[in-house]
Amino acid sequence: GTENAIFSVNNTYLEILAPRAKGAGADFVNSVIDADGEGLAGLALETSDIGRLKKELSERKVPTKKIVSGAGLDSQQNKSRTWQNLFFSRDLTRGLFIFAIQHESEKLQKSEVSRSTIDRLDHVVVHTNDPDGFVSLYRDKFGIKLSLDQTVEKWGGRMLFFRLNRTTIEVIGKLEKDGIPTDSFWGLAWSVSDLKAAHRRLTDVGVEVSNIRDGRKPRTIVCTVKSHTRGVPTLLIEQLDR
């Protein structure tokens, strides 16, 4: 029930969905837009063996739904792709739309990358009011590596960094649990090889971009994309030690 546009980068892909017909997919997209407007709707975690993943999660007492198959058709190239999904309840994921996916067809073709284009997803930002509960789910149950857990005294909060597939789930929260455990997506940070070239290219085509500035991470420079992001806070980042 949806029309999808897929943008492939080195370590993941961004999938944009729009409702086009009746069906569960269209119902989901419409519900997200009705509730929050356009923006970041969900996170897909790839697995090479979705049946084994479901079994392992069951052994860890993690409730899962049935594995469901999906298919998509590229009407322009007359190509199809197939996959299997394992969805998790919003009660488990504390409000986030999270699911596991196993691709059955060939890998998506990567886009041609120049120094002024995005080469990979650097990190996705999530807000939480229950950092300990987030660690319990994503590290202890999902098995995602927690690389760093730090307290930031400057603003009285806590930051968690989960690493997988050359990207990071960056979690920002309060020091202690506050109310009903709730997580929410915030934004995306994309890595580029040459931020000045990317900034110039975007400005030339009418995209509003902030001035380049030093990033919070040492030896990085960043800029904020301020238009055309469809409600998704978007940062571009260059690692200066490449």
Show where each model-derived region lies.
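Extended intrinsically disordered, low-complexity coil regions enriched in Ser, Thr, Gly, Ala
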Residues: 1, 18-25, 51-66, 132-156, ...
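An N-terminus-focused feature that recognizes amino-terminal "leader" regions
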Residues: 1-23, 237
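Acidic/polar active-site rim loop that often engages polyanionic ligands
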Residues: 34-39, 62
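A generic, well-ordered mixed alpha/beta core segment in the N-terminal half of proteins
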Residues: 39-50, 55-57
